[in-house]
Design a protein with these regions (language model features):
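Leloir-type glycosyltransferase catalytic cores
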Residues: 71-124, 227-298
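A short, charged/proline- and glycine-enriched loop
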Residues: 1, 9-13, 120-133
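Short acidic, S/G/P-rich loop/turn micro-motifs used as interaction or catalytic elements
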Residues: 50, 133-140, 163-165, 206
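Short, well-ordered alpha-helix to beta-strand connector turns
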Residues: 23, 38-41, 52-56, 124, ...
């Protein structure tokens, strides 16, 4: 199990510590791994790759405090969100309130130890939420950031990800002014609540938090890399459903077809996992032997 394995976390996030609320998902991880094995599937935590539609690997990660299951195939993981939205068989659960309460109760941060030096950095009307150093150069459009900065002047903050190098932070200050760059360790969700508009990427949980709280939310991604992120297939649909965000979230996330699991609201979460794996395996079966990536055995 990788989601809460100390050695694995040390490699991925270094000295940062995950929010303790995420440990509620540990039982889900164990159950998912067992069910994947029973169905002849490999499993992988927080990894993106492109396999055939008859995929080998069931991927999983955390998303806005939820457990998120998806196959390592773009076509199928995008279709599962569409199928979930069109599913009328699942009881509707109030996921929107769950997400809003996470912000209000200061539980939305993925990492612990977020600083609250808010008096030093008074809120502004617009907030740009950036990914970590390993993603910011390849996923974020600098031309878009310059355009946004020109539009809002000094009425905007750029929030570096907690995993951001001093070099990147220095470059941000050079580009957009030191007074417009928030500390990487400050509580971003305080500023998200105060802002009128949010700019973020398709690979960030801040997208759903901005949208569910009614903030006008827009992307800052480079188009050519946009579909590679593990949250793209959720955030892409969310960005086009801002007018009915709460009902979209509730209907989609409540469906087992979404791959979203949360034991705090999904009373029969094991059944939801079972139904999801059965559903995605049936979709997978359609493509058996359609595309062959290894030469046939003689």
């Amino acid at each position: 199990m990788e989601m809460f394995n100390k050695k694995e976390l040390d490699k991925r996030i270094g000295p940062l510590k995950k929010n303790k609320k995420l440990y509620d998902l540990e039982a889900v991880e164990g159950y998912v791994i067992r069910k994947a094995n029973e169905n002849g599937l490999e499993h992988s935590y927080d990894v993106m790759a492109e396999e055939m539609p008859y995929f080998k690997t069931l991927a999983y990660t955390e998303y806005a405090g939820n457990f998120y299951l998806q196959p390592l195939n773009f076509k199928l993981r995008n279709e599962q969100l569409i199928d979930a939205y069109n599913d009328n068989s699942s009881e509707i659960v109030d996921y929107s309130s769950l997400l809003i309460n996470r912000i209000v109760n200061n539980e939305a941060n993925k990492y612990t130890g977020r600083k609250e030096e808010f008096s030093k950095y008074l809120p502004k009307d617009y907030l740009v939420v950036l990914p970590g150093s390993n993603k910011v150069r390849e996923n974020v459009c600098l031309n878009r950031l310059k355009y946004i900065s020109k539009q809002h002047g000094d009425n905007i903050y750029f929030k570096p990800h907690p995993i951001t190098t001093h070099q990147i932070i220095g470059e941000l200050k050079d580009f957009f002014g030191e007074e417009n760059i928030l500390p990487r360790d400050i509580n971003m969700y305080y500023y998200l609540q105060k802002a009128k508009g949010i700019y973020t990427t398709h690979i960030s949980e801040s997208c759903i938090y901005g949208i569910v709280t009614g903030k006008k939310t827009e992307p800052i991604d480079v188009w050519n890399n946009i579909q590679r992120g593990s949250f793209y297939c959720i955030n892409n649909h969310l960005l086009t459903h801002q007018h009915d965000a709460k009902s979209f979230i509730n209907k989609t996330f409540s469906s087992y077809k979404s791959g979203i699991i949360n034991p705090s609201v999904d009373i029969n979460w094991k059944e939801k996992v079972d139904k999801y794996i059965d559903y995605i395996c049936k979709k997978r079966e359609v493509y058996k032997n359609w595309f062959i990536d290894n030469p046939p055995k003689k």
